[in-house]
Amino acid sequence: MDSPSGSLSPVAIDLAGVSKSYGGKIVVNDLSFTIAAGECFGLLGPNGAGKSTITRMILGMTSPSVGKITVLGAQEPGQVRLARAKIGIVSQFDNLDLEFTVRENLLVYGRYFRMSTREIETVIPSLLEFARLESKANTRVADLSGGMKRRLTLARALINDPQLLILDEPTTGLDPHARHLIWERLRSLLARGKTILLTTHIMEEAERLCDRLCVLEAGRKIAEGRPHALIEEQIGCPVIEIYGGDPQELSLLIRPNARRLEISGETLFCYTPDPEQVRAQLRAYSNLRLLERPPNLEDVFLRLTGREMEK
């Protein structure tokens, strides 16, 4: 695919003091963040955290109750048409025409942007190559695998060469192979200068793709930063997951060697700079299963909210 045409504003999206209420209930609460052109910025949080409402406001589909939103230099929602022409959208659900072929889906979608058939036909080969669907151009969408449909949805969003891509849970429901292929395609777009706003509840996805992210809970921002910086700041040591015993009893035993302990269900999470010492303390408990691993964004979310991310 061609590189993005035209110069980009150094700021792709800016939210300043944005709140949104429905029927007296606050669903987004005093939210501010800035997304630089060319970066991948993640909105990370469980269902109900406000991610969908935030993207709807960015797209001008609903107005903030309080605050200001600027997208690609256009203030939403008043100048929404100026911005929408430069935005590609990949929703959580494919919304493809199942009875049309892959090529026909691209042709129909291009016309929404008032592209001529000739213009669309010119870009279709590069879009098929990008999506690795060259051999499926004349295949009905109904006959594609789930991963192929997601790649087609992504390719379709690129038909007007947008400056900004908004991706809503782009790999939910995909198997690991299909998920990794989508991630590889998204990294190639970032290498070409596209800006991506990614909403996800998949921690690994956010950690692999995002330059920066905003962690949300109940419409509030509870953390913002680079994934690995957040992990180091909030956790900063190895993690041992302990299964099979009484978490309360085990906590008392290993607390002297733990930087922090968290209990989630029947699992005890031990954050410790000295994993070997903790293992030694637990050797007498033959029924335990221990998993030692590096810290990740799931730990950050648990640390900040006291609960695991809802799947």
UniProtKB/Swiss-Prot annotation:
Residues 13-243 form the ABC transporter domain. GO terms for molecular function: ATP binding; ATP hydrolysis activity; transmembrane transporter activity. Keywords: ATP-binding, Cell inner membrane, Cell membrane, Membrane, Nodulation, Nucleotide-binding, Plasmid, Translocase, Transport. SMART domains: AAA. Gene3D superfamilies: P-loop containing nucleotide triphosphate hydrolases. Disulfide bonds: none annotated. GO terms for cellular component: plasma membrane. Its EC number is 7.6.2.-. It comes from the Bacteria. InterPro entries: AAA+_ATPase, ABC_transporter-like_ATP-bd, ABC_transporter-like_CS, ABC_transporter_ATP-binding, ABC_transptNodI, P-loop_NTPase. Its main location: membrane. It is found in: Cell inner membrane. It is a peripheral membrane protein. ATP binds at residues 45-52. Part of the ABC transporter complex NodIJ involved in the export of the nodulation factors (Nod factors), the bacterial signal molecules that induce symbiosis and subsequent nodulation induction. Nod factors are LCO (lipo-chitin oligosaccharide), a modified beta-1,4-linked N-acetylglucosamine oligosaccharide. This subunit is responsible for energy coupling to the transport system. Belongs to the ABC transporter superfamily. Lipooligosaccharide exporter (TC 3.A.1.102) family. The complex is composed of two ATP-binding proteins (NodI) and two transmembrane proteins (NodJ). NCBIfam families: nodI (TIGR01288), PRK13536.1 (NF010059). This is Nod factor export ATP-binding protein I. It comes from Rhizobium johnstonii (strain DSM 114642 / LMG 32736 / 3841) (Rhizobium leguminosarum bv. viciae).
